């Protein structure tokens, strides 16, 4: 029997999106690499997930992922705007795009929570303003 308990954790700090692969030239050869900022953020996500996965096996079946992406309120905004943002009255349209945050999180969880992100069959996300930026992640194993 496999474990059907969900996995929940928080990735602290301002959310980061998955950066595009870059091309660098080494001699006469082109080389593709992932930007250092993306590698660092994926490492932070994996570390947060490892803390809650201690002693658990990797999820092998399909999963659903839920993200609550919380961006810090910009200091440059007025007190009124900040209050509205924290009350949910100002839409959160700050970069990075939610789909890029989702890609970064899904890729970082390969081999940590599940075997491969191809197992992610369902998902949802919400973007909000908040006092404490971070990404709240919940992985739910689905019955097969």
Residue ranges and their predicted role:
Residues 1-144:
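Acidic, proline/glycine-enriched N-terminal capping motif
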């Amino acid at each position: 029997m496999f474990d059907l308990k969900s996995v929940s954790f928080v990735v602290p700090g301002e959310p980061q999106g998955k950066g595009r692969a870059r091309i660098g030239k080494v001699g006469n050869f082109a080389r593709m690499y992932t930007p250092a900022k993306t590698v660092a953020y994926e490492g932070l996500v994996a570390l947060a997930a490892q803390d809650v996965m201690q002693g658990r096996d990797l999820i092998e079946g399909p999963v659903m992922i839920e993200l609550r992406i919380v961006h810090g309120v910009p200091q440059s905004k007025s007190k009124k705007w900040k209050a509205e943002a924290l009350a949910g009255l100002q839409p959160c349209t700050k970069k990075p795009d939610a789909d890029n945050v989702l890609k970064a999180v899904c890729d970082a969880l390969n081999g940590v929570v599940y075997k491969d992100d191809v197992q992610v069959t369902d998902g949802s996300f919400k973007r909000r303003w908040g006092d404490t930026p971070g990404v709240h992640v919940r992985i739910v194993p689905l019955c097969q």
